[in-house]
Regions:
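Charged, low-complexity intrinsically disordered segments
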Residues: 3-6
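Acetyl-CoA-dependent GNAT
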Residues: 8-90, 101-112, 160-166, 181-185, ...
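Conserved hydrophobic beta-strand within the GNAT/NAT acetyltransferase core sheet
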Residues: 82, 117-121
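Active-site acidic-Proline motif in GNAT/NAT acetyltransferases
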Residues: 88-90, 94, 123-124
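Short, charged, solvent-exposed linker or helix-capping segments at domain edges/interfaces
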Residues: 166-176
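Intrinsically disordered, low-complexity serine/threonine-rich segments
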Residues: 174-177, 181-184, 188
Length: 230
């Protein structure tokens, strides 16, 4: 199974997956709007185990997450929103939905600095509620009456993304740490450098212990005189 960014060529396939699995359906241009406006945030799950019969075969998309950033958040806080999540019935209980969600959440923080992500779910959709609440850690903020076209209520849920923000910051900090040692005079202490030159000017020997390779048949430390004799 391969999780990758949604491409415009995938749109008819994710629309098919949506029609197969969800009662909330959208026009193709709505998917295109997401793909063009926030290309970093939507992902598809591709069944790579299915061999292609020809080079022109479409990939077998078995799941997708359609996401966006709220353009004018009412609370003034930059955050993302999950518009739609779907996995084909033949590929459920494999952790695909969780992977799609986590990938989208990470992209929201990396690309847009999102502070949290929101979504709506039918109050009768127990499997989805379990995924969002128990697996991913979403919190139920409120119930919106008659949110869906058929009159069913929806839970408005939200997940704080501060842990992802901290993880990204920690990784950035660790990449910036130089654990190596100075080579030659680069990065050396100027005071020690002057002392070394002064000792050489007074005719003192500058000795250093070096390890000689085993290939030469010597396994001890020897002293090497590096001072130039006049």
């Amino acid at each position: 199974m391969d999780i990758r960014i949604l491409k415009p060529s995938d749109l008819p396939l994710i629309q098919h997956a949506n029609l197969e699995n969800l009662p909330e359906n959208y026009f193709l241009k709505y998917y295109l709007y997401h793909a063009l406006s926030w290309p970093q945030l939507s992902f598809v799950a591709v069944d790579v185990a299915r061999p292609k019969k020809t080079p022109y075969d479409y990939p077998k998309i078995v799941g997708y997450v359609l996401a966006k950033m709220e353009e004018e958040p009412t609370d003034g806080v930059q955050h993302g929103h999950i518009t739609s999540l779907s996995v084909m019935r033949t590929h459920r209980r494999l952790g695909i939905a969780e992977k799609l969600m986590r990938q989208s959440q990470l992209a929201m923080v990396e690309s847009f600095g999102a502070h949290y992500v929101s979504l709506h779910v039918r109050v009768s959709n127990g499997a989805a509620i379990h995924l969002y609440k128990d697996t991913l850690g979403f919190q139920n903020e409120k119930t919106e009456k008659a949110y869906y076209a058929d009159g069913e209520d929806a839970y408005s849920m939200r997940l704080d993304l501060s842990s992802i923000r901290e993880q990204i910051q920690d990784e950035a900090d660790s990449e910036g740490v130089d654990e190596g040692e100075a080579v030659g005079d680069v990065g050396s202490d100027p005071a020690k450098k002057k002392t070394k030159k002064k000792a050489a000017g007074n005719g003192e020997k500058d000795k250093r212990k070096v390890k000689v390779g085993r290939g030469l048949g010597v396994g001890e430390l020897v002293e090497k005189n590096e001072a130039k004799q006049p």
